Regions:
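Membrane-embedded alpha-helical segments of transport systems
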Residues: 28-34, 53-70, 91-101, 205-211, ...
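Selected transmembrane alpha-helices and immediately adjacent juxtamembrane segments
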Residues: 1-6, 86-200, 278-289
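Extended, low-charge hydrophobic alpha-helical regions
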Residues: 14, 20, 34-50, 159-285
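Membrane-interface alpha-helices
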Residues: 5-12, 46, 76-81, 276-278
Length: 289
């Protein structure tokens, strides 16, 4: 609460509430959990702003892609800078996400969600010894396991559908390849390609499968594929036309694109509105493109 109180002045300039920084921090772990964490914000308007913008901070499903691309394309000096430059690039990506969150919050305050920021009154309760058992139970059972089970329930069917699309052929090409060719012009227009867009679409249920799906499409294996080393991954991607600029574009698109299905379901549950769920989908998608 003290951190939120200290940052309230900054967030108030964007028309948001200081407690939004806490839901953003939860979003770094899981955006669905971050959306649920927005319940701590009392003002309905500011709570809705926090819910809509929570996806603009990278979750643990998007961090692996960002980290591996930074390691593959920014560690090329052969010196101690190979550890510093990727770390700086990841930090910059996170800062872009935080900046986008504040910018979108400001725009929402001036357009769809007009209003005056509420007052943040910090109450200091008496210090008490933490109830370790209760905290562990709440964190593991009520939150972590619940979110993981819900994510697994959505991701498993998506993996099966992706496998089918990659193994059902129309002519000499699979349906997945036909779809990638169809999306190729749009992908090229934003510095990506059709296969990258297909991978992100396939990753709608779970962002963790974006890179395996992309490698599957590039290598035409018909099964989710992993890579043996960073060097082998870089060679695969560069042989398919990737450059450092492509890697930067993919990292930014991963940061800013639409929420995963679990997050959208959570937004629908928290807001009870299809309109605001659609807004939470279309706003980051528009920013990403």
């Amino acid at each position: 609460p003290r951190v939120a109180f200290n940052l309230d002045h900054l967030f108030k300039k964007a028309g948001a509430h200081g407690k939004m920084c806490l839901s953003m921090c939860m979003g770094f772990g899981c955006n669905a959990a971050g959306v649920i964490g927005c319940r701590i914000i009392d003002s309905p308007r500011e709570r809705l702003i926090a819910i809509i913008t929570n996806n603009l901070v990278p979750c643990n499903g998007r961090f692996p892609l960002i980290i591996v691309l930074s390691a593959a394309f920014f560690a090329f000096t052969g010196s101690f800078l190979d550890s510093i430059i990727p770390a700086l690039s990841i930090t910059l990506i996170v800062l872009v996400g935080v900046s986008a969150t504040l910018a979108v919050s400001y725009l929402l305050t001036k357009t769809l969600l007009k209003g005056v920021p509420s007052t943040f009154t910090l109450e200091l309760p008496p210090y008490r010894a933490p109830q370790v058992g209760r905290i562990i139970y709440t964190s593991i059972i009520d939150r972590t396991v619940f979110v993981l089970l819900r994510a697994a329930a959505v991701a498993a069917p998506a993996g099966a559908v992706t496998w089918l699309l990659a193994n059902i052929y129309v002519g000499e090409l699979s349906i997945l390849i036909h779809a990638a060719n169809f999306l190729e012009p749009l992908g090229r227009a934003i510095g990506l390609d059709g296969f990258i867009l297909i991978a992100f679409i396939a990753g709608f249920p779970a962002n963790e499968i974006v890179m395996p799906v992309l490698l599957m499409a590039y290598m035409s294996t018909g099964a989710l594929t992993d890579y043996e080393s960073i060097d082998s991954l870089r060679q695969i991607l560069m042989s398919n036309g990737w450059t450092i600029l492509t890697a930067i574009n993919v990292m930014l698109f991963s940061l800013l694109h639409w929420p995963c299905s679990t997050t959208l379901l959570t937004i629908k549950k928290e807001t009870g509105s299809l309109k605001w769920t659609f807004a939470a989908f279309i706003i980051p998608t528009g920013i990403a493109f």
